[in-house]
Regions:
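Aromatic-anchored segments of alpha-helical transmembrane domains
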Residues: 50, 140-149, 222-233
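Membrane-interface loops
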Residues: 56, 63-72, 123-216, 260-297, ...
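Interfacial helix-loop-helix junctions of multi-pass membrane proteins
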Residues: 154-158, 190, 226-252
Length: 308
């Protein structure tokens, strides 16, 4: 028996089935393309973070004496404002083994969480992902000079100076952590806290990826608040470091918002995507539109995504 569907008037129309099949195949190809693009974006983020690590270690390492002097000054400044809460917070957490295990794991896995948030934004809100990606690049670049201008020893190194913090990632964890202990790269880069800076970016990706009922925004705020608790409890950052990371993220978001619509490499990249979209088997794929900070452009991007 021939297979097919009926068209208008109940007449058999094999073309209807063929057309629907083509639509489904095109949708599948678009989905596969987006998954591949998301994987490529994770690779890009990995490369940026690796370059950041190398630059921070190579060009922005400062003498330990200056870093400890700055830490003592910062503790005094915080004390004058009643903000030296890190040691009391850690002492409370140390009474609960399960909580220490939780914060150690949360701290250690913050980069995988960043990549996951990026993938969600790539899949569900690619235009929003691109805008926030600009902020990610900006906050990463803005952080580097601060490590040379204001090297800062983290709380976990301050026990010899009368502040008996515990390095929980080394002392109370079975898994070694490259970011903890004197063997890691540039140990005097506590200010600003890039755990907070990059977690702010992750929170924005969640917000654009899951807008319904503001679920993404709520999850992002929860993630950000948890990270603030974690970096203090593990002895890695002071309150001022947290505020510095948040301030730097806010500046980066403002830069991303006001950047021009088309950056120098945008046109060339879109030509490549346009060429790929015209290849056989990739029909229906289009270059992703560029997003600037204007509300009109954002509305146009959302309309284009709904129509895709």
């Amino acid at each position: 028996m021939a297979s097919g569907r009926t068209g208008r008037g109940g007449r058999f129309s094999p073309g209807v089935t063929a057309n629907r099949l083509r639509v489904r195949v095109a949708a599948l190809l678009r989905g596969s393309w987006r998954l591949a693009w998301a994987a490529g974006q994770v690779g890009l983020l990995l490369a940026i973070l690796q370059a950041y690590t190398v630059l921070r270690r190579t060009f922005f390492q400062q003498p330990a004496g200056e870093a400890f002097a700055n830490a003592l000054d910062l503790i005094r400044w915080q004390g004058a404002l009643g903000l030296n809460v890190e040691l009391d917070l850690q002492r409370w957490a140390l009474r609960h083994d399960w909580l220490i295990d939780l914060v150690n794991g949360y701290y250690r896995n913050f980069k995988p969480a960043l990549y996951l948030c990026a993938v969600l934004a790539c899949l569900f809100a690619p235009a929003g992902y691109r805008l926030v990606r600009r902020a990610f690049v900006a906050v990463t670049l803005l952080a580097l000079p601060w490590y040379a201008l204001f090297p800062l020893a983290p709380p976990r190194f301050m026990a010899p100076y009368g502040y008996p913090f515990v390095d929980t990632l080394n002392a109370l964890s079975t898994t070694p952590n490259a970011t903890s202990g004197f063997t890691a790269a540039n140990q005097y880069a506590a200010m600003p806290s890039m755990h907070m800076g990059w977690t702010s970016i992750a929170a924005l990706w969640l917000a654009v990826a899951l807008p319904r009922w503001r679920l993404g925004a709520l999850l992002g705020l929860l993630h950000l608040a948890m990270m603030a608790f974690v970096v203090m409890t593990t002895g890695n950052h002071y309150v001022f470091d947290i505020l510095g990371g948040l301030l730097l993220a806010a500046i980066a978001i403002a830069i991303a918002w006001w950047l021009p619509d088309r950056l120098p490499w945008t046109a060339a990249w879109n030509r490549i995507l346009g060429w790929l979209a015209r290849r056989p088997g990739l029909a229906g794929l289009r270059p992703a539109p560029v997003l600037d900070g204007s509300p009109a452009r954002r509305a146009a991007e959302r309309a284009a995504e709904r129509a895709a």
